[in-house]
Amino acid sequence: DCHKEYDEHKTVEKYNDMLNLKKKLLKSSNAKTDLSHNMIENELFDVVKKISSLATDNDALSKCEPLSYNVMSIKEKIPFNNLLCNDVEGLVSSYFLYIKDLFKSLDNASFEAIASSFKHSYCQAVRQQLDQEDIFETLVQWVKKKTQCANSVARIIVSYFIQNCDVYGKLSR
C-alpha cells in the first residue's frame, strides 16, 4: 500500500524527503559498518560489569566525591540538541566520578587505549557526516555490540567519554 501510494501520488517534496531519509540511513549504516571493525579493550568489559552492578549496589555511587565541571561544558559540545545534551548531562552528573574511579584502577596505558578507541570511533562517525545524535547512538550501539552490555550502560559509558573530551571535543588537526 505504501509503495503504491508513493508511486501514484509522488511529489517533489515527498521524493526529496525519501531521498534525504535514504541518505541519512546510508550514512548511519556506513558508520556502523566502520565501527564494527573497531576493537574494544578487554579492560572495558570490567568497567561495563561494574556499571551494570549499580542496578543492585546502592552504595557505590555515594562513595564518589561531587562532580566539579572545569572543562568544556556539555552544552558547548552539544549546542544544537537540547534533549541529547540534557540526557548526557544527567548521565555525567550521576556516573562520571564513579567511572573515573573505575578507570583509575587500570594502568594508564589501558585507559589510553580505551580512550583512543573511542576517539577513533568518534572520528569515523564524524567522517560519515552524522549529526550529533546519530553519532551518540552509533557509539552506543558499538559499545553494546562489543561488550554485550545493556543499552543504559552503553549510554553511560559514551556519556563519560563525551565529558572526558574523547567524543564531541575539539579535534586537533
What is each PLM-predicted segment?
Residues 1:
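Short HxH-centered metal-ligating active-site micro-motif
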Residues 4-46:
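Polybasic, low-complexity binding patches
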Residues 9-12, 49-59, 145-151, 168-173:
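Hydrophobic transmembrane alpha-helix bundles
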Residues 30-33, 52, 56-59, 107, ...:
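Residue-level signal for secondary-structure boundary elements
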Residues 36-79:
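Short flanking/linker segments adjacent to small metal-binding domains or redox-active Cys/His motifs
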Residues 64-173:
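C-terminal, charged low-complexity interaction regions
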